[in-house]
A protein has these predicted regions:
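Short, charged recognition helix plus adjacent turn
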Residues: 71-100, 104
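A short, Lys/Arg-rich alpha-helix, primarily the initiator
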Residues: 1-21
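Conserved hydrophobic/aromatic packing and binding residues within compact polymer-binding modules
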Residues: 14, 25-29, 39-43, 69
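Recognition helix of helix-turn-helix/homeodomain-like DNA-binding domains
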Residues: 33-49, 74
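DNA major-groove recognition helix of helix-turn-helix/homeodomain DNA-binding modules
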Residues: 33, 53-68
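Short C-terminal boundary/hinge segments that cap the last helix of small helical domains
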Residues: 63-78, 299
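Short coil turns linking two alpha-helices in DNA-binding domains
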Residues: 24, 35-38, 51, 65
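Conserved binding/catalytic microenvironments
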Residues: 6, 106-404
Length: 404
């Protein structure tokens, strides 16, 4: 039996068992933590299920032996090897740099140098250059720990602000690289440093980073609790028109839209997008407060992501056609292009999907090649195009190649 035949057989089996249990597609989607569009595509044989963990979740929800579903679907092994930069970033979090700083009595590096390196850390994060980021942080984090203990008291708050921003960059990169545990540690350290700096907005920025960890780990209840409470705390400053608070509140509200989309709640998702759009309109373009990149263009990017998650490919592609990404980072542009590829995939437009993925890869090669969603999407595209084109085959090879 060919792979497409397996997909169709599995889809029919799932549909039969779902109806046998008296479940609707939305009910099954909630039980397996997926979108209604995903369930529909699986049942129609459009989307491939090739991960044992997903089959296990479906079997449990449908109350059937796993063997009955596994017999219908060939499960492929996950890509081995570690994304570039991931190991180095984990080592940054593992070093006993605070202890060394307490004991060795070194002089503090110049604050100007620490400021420059912290800005560079975020430049590398926005560019998706994670190997270079890990190399930079291996020196920057120990220097910040030393400075926190060696600078005069009146400079200490700024050092902790730089430390918070550095750990936020580390968390953002690790979340993109599929390292939720390490990303959580980095986000927690960022919030602790922001607290020691006495900077509530920087604490909110740390919460914003933590939410990405929760979303990637599918801990939507924790993600919603963090976004809701942080946004509520910022509301008075938003009402006063404080740009930094507006950016953070807007970023958190966009995250709430994504969470609602994952939970298949379109009314809430689009409602949150509308609220964020209103604040973005007041704020205007050209802001990157706390590296949120919040503004009208970023709201449109999230509209694309939400629409794709809800299975509304048409809305996603219309939004993509209208967005101006010239002012956004390479990382954000690549993320949007992956969502555009997903929308084309939902319409079985393989050539357009591959073109979007290649553009995304050109923007941030490390991020795209290490992204599990991109690998799954490419696998799906391979089953749609028979035989697959040269560009798609070459992309698949790059995604499954073991990192150097």
């Amino acid at each position: 039996m060919t792979t497409p035949d397996y997909q169709k057989a599995l889809g029919r089996k799932i549909a039969v068992e779902r109806r046998r249990r008296g479940l609707s597609q939305p009910e099954l989607a909630r039980m397996v933590d997926r979108s209604v569009a995903w369930v529909s595509q699986v049942e129609r044989g459009v989307r491939k299920v090739d991960r044992m963990s997903v089959l296990e979740a479906l079997a449990a929800a449908l109350d059937v032996p796993l063997a009955e579903l596994a017999a219908e679907a060939p499960v492929v092994a996950a890509v081995t090897g570690e994304p570039p930069g991931a190991g180095g970033l984990r080592l940054v979090l593992s070093g006993a740099y605070a202890l060394r700083a307490m004991l060795d009595g070194r002089r503090a590096p110049a604050l100007s140098t620490l400021r420059t390196k912290t800005r560079k850390a975020w430049e590398l994060t926005h560019a998706g250059r994670y190997t270079e980021l890990s190399e930079l942080l291996r020196g920057l984090v120990p220097d910040l720990e030393t400075a926190a203990r060696a600078v005069p008291e009146d400079q200490r708050a700024e050092v902790f602000e730089l430390m918070a921003a550095t750990y936020q960059a580390c968390s953002a990169a690790l979340a993109k690289l599929g390292e939720p545990d390490a990303a959580w540690i980095a986000a927690d350290r960022a919030m602790a440093a922001a607290d020691r700096a006495g900077n509530p907005l920087l604490v909110a920025a740390g919460a914003f980073r933590l939410v990405f960890v929760f979303i990637n780990a599918r801990r939507y209840d924790q993600a919603e609790e963090t976004t809701r409470t942080a946004a509520e705390a910022l509301q008075p400053m938003v009402n006063q028109g404080t740009p930094q608070a507006m950016s953070l509140w807007g970023g958190l509200t966009l995250q709430r839209a994504v969470i609602a989309a994952h939970l298949n709640d379109p009314d809430t998702a689009y409602g949150q997008l509308e609220q964020a759009s209103q604040v973005a309109g007041r704020l205007g373009e050209g802001h990157n407060e706390y590296n949120t990149e919040f503004g009208p263009a970023n709201v449109r990017l999230y509209e694309i992501a939400v629409a794709v998650e809800l299975g509304d490919a048409g809305r996603a592609l219309r939004a993509a056609a209208a967005v101006d990404t010239s002012g956004l980072s390479a990382e954000r542009r690549a993320r949007m292009l992956v969502d555009v590829a997903r929308a084309h995939s939902q319409r079985r437009q393989v050539r357009e999907a591959v073109a979007a993925l290649l553009q995304a890869e050109a923007n941030t090669p490390e991020q795209v090649r290490s992204h599990s969603l991109v690998r799954q999407l490419t696998s799906d595209l391979l089953t749609m195009q028979d035989p697959p084109g040269a560009e798609l085959r070459d992309l698949s090879k790059r995604l499954t190649a073991k990192p150097d």
